[in-house]
Amino acid sequence: ASMAIGAPAASACWYGDKSDVTILYTNDVHTYIDKQSPKLTYAAIADLKQSYQNAGKDVLLVDAGDHIQGTAYGSMDDGATIIELMNEAGYDLATPGNHEFDYGMARAKAVIQEADFPYVSCNWVDLRTGFNVLPSVKFFFVGGRKIAFVGVTTPETFTKSTPAYFMDKSQSRYIYDLSLIHISEPTRPLYI
């Protein structure tokens, strides 16, 4: 799985009056969209977010990965239904988990395009260009605060997904990487 880290920026970045910010998150949903116990459906998540908003609260809804694969709901259409549900639920941000790559690299990129919310990952790198495939960070200005989310896609994706999806098969070489060597000094790992 992957994670998104929310952290308030320094107090110098606060703007005007500050209020509490509620961060709702999902992780490792694995397409269990009709889970009855506890009743955690996308409709229930959307209702929870809306109830905070109706009460005048600042709220963000984020997902830390592994949402498009796991049951027949995902495999029937390679996760398209899940992205539609997440769009309807009002997600603000997501980061790809290792299972977002289970339907292939082209599908992983298509999922991101289908989403009405941005994806972030600081360590999904295109080795042909040396650049990140996605933005590393997303800033939100809510509740008088500047809040940053940094996406990290688990480096174990190569062993938990299909390594061939990260390769140029015609040249038998990797063209994508999920290690953190591209973003930090070797003595300062960002992922533990």
Predicted feature descriptions by range:
Residues 1-8:
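Sec-dependent N-terminal signal peptides of Gram-positive bacterial secreted proteins and lipoproteins
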Residues 12-184, 188:
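Acidic, metal/ion-coordinating pockets
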